[in-house]
Amino acid sequence: MTRKLVLLRHGQSQWNLDNRFTGWVDVELTDQGRQEAVAAGKLMKDEGLQFDVAHTSVLKRAIHTLQGALKELDQDWLPVSKSWRLNERHYGGLQGLDKAETAAKHGEEQVKIWRRSYDIPPPAMDVNDPGHPCHDRRYATLDRNALPGTESLATTLVRVLPYWHDAIAPQLKAGQTVLVTAHGNSLRALYKYLNDVSNEQILELNIPTGIPLLFELDDNLQVRSFRYLGDPEAAKRAAEAVANQGKAK
């Protein structure tokens, strides 16, 4: 039996548009981002996908993308689970900074390492910074020590995997079709795990906003195939645009 899993990065956010490091900052979708959510729903509808359950983060850009896609799918009623474990990677002291200006200051190669390397985190955010997640009530029930002040992709994967094993994988093994709407780096972490991508290869992976990535898995949740829905060239161009965000102007 083939299991189906769709990974969907949220639509364009205001800070995507502004080319700023976002991380755990809870920013809104742009008008384009809302349109991308609807377009993603249409692509999934055209594919004939009927989901049994959906998962998202606790950040509104992912939540609103999921809502827009489900409305287009006419599956608004779908059970939705929200978890902080699906949040974007925490960008530490870089959060809020302009990516191009940061590249001009520190060099494009350093910014690429901070953005795309596997195990090198950006400079940490001080725990006394008002933006640290320990001061946000949506995380009030969590162990303060579990809340990051910065993350690499490696530590993001450590955060995401328990949710995969405890929540998503059992549903797929039960034959359910699952939609996960999250963020560029939490989805890169899942992609790395599912496809057994090397630490070096993951550096070059960029996930575009608002384009559903369909995985077909076997009974043991091994990947049989995966592809972006819609025009492959459009997905390629969108991924290249993501890669260019960390370059100096």
Curated annotation (Swiss-Prot):
Domain of life: Bacteria
Keyword Isomerase: yes
Marked site (Transition state stabilizer) residue numbers: H183
Gene source species: Xanthomonas euvesicatoria pv. vesicatoria (strain 85-10) (Xanthomonas campestris pv. vesicatoria)
Gene: gpmA
Keyword set, alphabetical order: Gluconeogenesis, Glycolysis, Isomerase
UniProt subunit comment: Homodimer.
Its biological purpose: Catalyzes the interconversion of 2-phosphoglycerate and 3-phosphoglycerate.
SMART domains per UniProt: PGAM
Binding positions for substrate per the UniProt entry: 9-16, 22-23, 61, 88-91, 99, 115-116, 184-185
Gene Ontology BP term (one): glycolytic process
Family to which the UniProt record says this protein belongs: Belongs to the phosphoglycerate mutase family. BPG-dependent PGAM subfamily.
PROSITE patterns attached to this UniProt entry: PG_MUTASE (PS00175)
Protein name in the entry: 2,3-bisphosphoglycerate-dependent phosphoglycerate mutase
One Pfam family recorded for the sequence: His_Phos_1
EC number annotated for this UniProt entry: 5.4.2.11
Catalytic-site annotation from UniProt: H10, E88
Catalytic reactions of this protein: (2R)-2-phosphoglycerate = (2R)-3-phosphoglycerate
Pathway: Carbohydrate degradation; glycolysis; pyruvate from D-glyceraldehyde 3-phosphate: step 3/5
Gene Ontology MF, one: phosphoglycerate mutase activity
